[in-house]
Amino acid sequence: MEKKYRFYLVNAFGLPEGSRYAHRSLKGPKEEVLMNYDNVKHLLADVEWDLHNGAIASYGDWPVENREEFGLAAAARIPLVREGCESGKYNAIVLLGGGEPGFNESREIGRKFNIPVTACGHSQMHFATMLGNKFSVIDMAESHNMYYYNLIIQHRMDHRCASIRNINYPLPRPGGDESRSIPKEKKKALAGEHSDMVETAVTEAVAAIEEDGAEVITFGCSALFWLQPFLQKRLTELGWEIPVLEGYSCAIELAKAMVNLGVDASGLTFPVDHPKKIRRKKTF
């Protein structure tokens, strides 16, 4: 029996095999390639899903982090979204990656096929604003912070965002500090060992609550999404009754909600090439 949900999950970028800067699996079964699959497999149990591991990055063999790289990643991902929509196999597209390159362009494509497109940052922000007055973002590097800052403004969430807190664990790239390794810190945490990265995230989350007024915690880069259960547990143990969200879960669940509602996006926000009606004026 065909499942109700048929999703195409598309990573933000891919890296060539053998890249020394890879921070996630580059090949293998989809369950092994999808980061933090164990944290979202219960949400995918009722979904027929395929995964594209992302178009190979054109800027180099390291993960995307700054504006130039995000622009190139967006241009490479958009054709994958169109292919997914044209295939007729899917009723939603889920864009993986916290910085959501190509999201608005993908929504425009999806609208033409009546297919909703969701992304991690957008989904987290909207769920967060349903749960509390203001949210803070735990993020990993200065350049990514400022890219994400603009993303928050683009989604008109600047009045609901308390702060972006930088834990300073940049993604691997040429000339970077290899001692501050996200994969190594993740491995320690999963093994039940002390992780400086987890401790830093806890410190910054508490500061976001006490100093910035955050009532919900979210994440910027998807390389940090694995922190969600660790941070949620630690904050609860400290007595903070605050939800901690991560992007994959939010994007998957928002896609389900949109399929259930039979909506994709407003045709006034994303008009087709030859709309039946036009507006003479757009106000702010």
Q: Over which residues does each language-model region extend?
A:
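Short beta-strand segments enriched in small/hydrophobic residues
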Residues: 2-33, 55, 135-139
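N-terminal beta-loop-helix "entrance" segment that forms/cooperates
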Residues: 48-74, 175-176
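Glycine-rich, highly charged phosphate/nucleotide-binding loops
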Residues: 65-83, 195-204
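Glycine/small-residue-rich loop that forms an oxyanion/phosphate-binding "nest" at active or ligand-binding sites
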Residues: 78-127
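Periplasmic-binding protein-like
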Residues: 87-97, 214-222, 245
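Short, acidic/small-residue loops that bind anionic groups at enzyme active sites
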Residues: 107-131, 233-252
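Short, glycine-/small-residue-rich phosphate/pyrophosphate-handling segment
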Residues: 126-168, 256-284
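Active-site rim beta-loop-alpha module in soluble metabolic enzymes
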Residues: 151-220
